[in-house]
Amino acid sequence: MTEELQYVYVTTTGWKSGNPHTIEIWFVAYDGRYYIVSEHRERSHWVQNIRRNPAIAFRVGDRHFQGRGRVVDPTAEPELAAAVCALMDAKYDWSDGLIVELHPESEIAGGG
């Protein structure tokens, strides 16, 4: 089902405000996790939020998750970075940016 879906909705906690911040962004699924790419790399507020507090909530279709986000280091994990870039290129014809992994730790029954 995730092959058909175009967007994931990711909620981070604002590192300055402490308020929830939700984005809509392209994604790919790989090996039980979800991956998104920040076009603006470290300048994206949501990346800064994840760097400071990796606890996230996210929605893929009608599935809601609590989990953790982390930036993928392409130097330390070249195979993972290459796989994610290939999937993004195949799905969206674009993969230029900072890769962030969304690791679902629990699914929220009933969507929230």
Which ranges hold each PLM region?
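Short beta-strand segments
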Residues: L5-E39, I56
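Short, structured beta-strand-loop surface elements
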Residues: R41-G111
